[in-house]
Amino acid sequence: MAASSSSSSSMASPRGRSIRETVLETVAAYHQQQRMRRKFRKSLSYAGELSSAGRARGEGGASSSASTTSLCGPDEDDEPFWEEEEGTVELVQLGANRAKNVLILMSDTGGGHRASAQAIKDPFRIEFGDDYRVFVKDLCKDHAGWPLNNMESSYKFMVKHVQLWKVAFHTTSPRWVHCFYLAALASFYAKKVEAGLKKYKPDIIISVHPLMQHIPLWVLKWQGLQNRVVFVTVITDLNTCHPTWFHADVNRCYCPSEEVAKRAALDDLQPSQIRVFGLPIRPSFCRAVLVKDDLRKELELDPELPAVLLMGGGEGMGPVKKTAKALGESLFDKELGKPIGQLIVICGRNKTLSSSLQALEWKIPIKVRGFETQMEKWMGACDCIITKAGPGTIAEALIRGLPIILNDFIPGQEVGNVPYVVDNGAGVFSKSSRETAKLVARWFGPDSDELKRMSEKALKLAQPEAVFDIVRDIHELSREQGVISQISSSLTSSFFIPSPETTPIQLM
């Protein structure tokens, strides 16, 4: 351990030393520590063999002596693992170029967390090929117990009873409340979470959920891995954030807006930990070159009529049917006897809603769709969007330059998304289906200039490169994590190998 301590000192104070000398000393210290661990395990194994031999033969002195020579004699680990020739350093390290494991922690409490996780996964492959292996997992669902493994159904129940969710959101906001609550859960499930981390052997952990910071970070700290595993948080709320998003021990906290960054600073995160890049959105939204006329032809839309996109989220929630019927009336010009616009309705998984809309008589062109995986095409083919204030949908609409009409929000985390859109001139808020329909009719008629201005402001507010900026910064963090992290092929071995210098720490 003294060698390791000396190594840390040399890295912290490199003045008067060359980088080459520092690297060599650090590598040597790390290798010595690994050799000590292996010899410790062998000594335990040897003691077990002596005990077994004594019981079997009664008198095993000669045999034991031979075993001692075999176990403690020359070891291949004692050979130099670097060679210095003509001023160069060659590191001979098995697995030095191995792919790093990235574990993205999420939970299906709303569709935004999984969408953000999947959005982050793809750029690792696009930017860095096979350098990273990315796993998207609900760690609490797979490796914890109640209530952590039941968050998805609990969340769905509470958002259907919004006042209940509002109470839960605000009563758990004080730090002492949620820290006590999470510490209590950790006392029951930390070992199971540790087993989950062990399964994936992460070099990098990315949390896209507010409850996926505390327990994994505590596990890393107990195992002495907080300085070896890169841990970052990607916040998926545009404005209003629950305080559990912010943890002072993360390497980075990626904020989607300046307002969120200010909240992070108030929760003791340092400027070096905070980055403002935007909300991570799938590369198919960010970089695809989509022409509206081509998309309308592909999706079998009327090429001449402006189109409004009405969304009810993944579950088809909200006043979708009522708003659709109001749009069916307002977008039909009775004097001319023809439609002035067309309607696309995304019903998500709500098959009842989809069937009821398809059964109605319509005076305007309409497309009724279920759960869609290519929203970039439908958004690209439309001229404006009506949706609840979900952060992912808002960010996608901004990238497509769609003026937004927000018709609902979930109390708590979605409240701040309304002023984020409205104050930046990218949309309006209206809970009245009739007023919403009248507004769309004006945008498609005499107020078309207002629609154009809002489209320009939406594009200005958009951050299409956010997900690539996040992934590149994580890549740089991983490279800067330290010489030990870069050269070791068994970075997370401490999850599995007990150190002779330490004993496991248990949370009581």
From Swiss-Prot:
Disordered: region residues: 51-79
Its EC number(s): 2.4.1.46
Protein name, UniProt field: Probable monogalactosyldiacylglycerol synthase 3, chloroplastic
Function: Involved in the synthesis of the major structural component of photosynthetic membranes.
Entry similarity comment: Belongs to the glycosyltransferase 28 family.
Source lineage: Eukaryota, Viridiplantae, Streptophyta, Embryophyta, Tracheophyta
Catalytic activity, as annotated: a 1,2-diacyl-sn-glycerol + UDP-alpha-D-galactose = a 1,2-diacyl-3-O-(beta-D-galactosyl)-sn-glycerol + UDP + H(+)
UniProt keywords, alphabetically: Chloroplast, Glycosyltransferase, Membrane, Plastid, Transferase, Transit peptide
One Pfam family linked to the record: MGDG_synth
Primary enzyme class: transferase
GO molecular function term, any single one: 1,2-diacylglycerol 3-beta-galactosyltransferase activity
InterPro entries: Diacylglyc_glucosyltr_N, Glyco_trans_28_C, Glycosyltransf_28_UgtP
Subcellular location(s) per record: Plastid, Chloroplast membrane
GO process terms (BP): glycolipid biosynthetic process
Transit peptide: 1-60
Gene Ontology annotations for the cellular component aspect, listed alphabetically: chloroplast membrane
